[in-house]
């Protein structure tokens, strides 16, 4: 599996489509805004492709190999926020997500990693999917922090791997930082 940092100018339609189909609309930052936000804050947006013979960058890989997934990580001094993690629906359940997550954890070893996911406890149409996702993260060394949030009617649970704890205050600080970046983002224009 090959992975490449994503340059906003080189983001191809397959990457955009995966982002826009893997997450409910209410959980997405609009694509144009996400590309602008990447110019304001330090986000590690990585795309993953099947191994192939040779290529030099993400745009070349996109033409010669199948897209396996994407991740967006917000590296912070205290911990890393695993913000978005997606594998195409037709490839789920084949161990690809496990390989990507293993690479991510290895890349960011030495610091704890935090993620939020739709709560497996909330009664909803996709409750089985949420339970499978929660079990996936538990199998991969994440644990529930006891911190939760609700946004646009969706309950989220915060999970962590690594040492230490994660508190509501930690979560509130991240949200304040994100708002600050959002407010300072260059406007379209």
Model-derived regions, located:
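Short amphipathic alpha-helix that is part of the acyltransferase structural core
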Residues: 1-33, 60, 169-189
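Active-site rim helix/loop that mediates acceptor-substrate recognition in acyltransferases
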Residues: 20-55
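C-terminal "cap" of GNAT-fold acetyltransferases
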Residues: 46, 130, 150-189
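Conserved beta-strand in the GNAT
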Residues: 47, 65-74, 79-86
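Intrinsically disordered, low-complexity terminal tails and inter-domain linkers enriched
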Residues: 51-65
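Conserved acetyl-CoA-binding loop-helix of GNAT-fold acetyltransferases
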Residues: 87, 93-107
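Conserved GNAT acetyl-CoA-binding A-motif
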Residues: 108-129
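Conserved acetyl-CoA-binding loop of GNAT-fold acetyltransferases
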Residues: 135-145
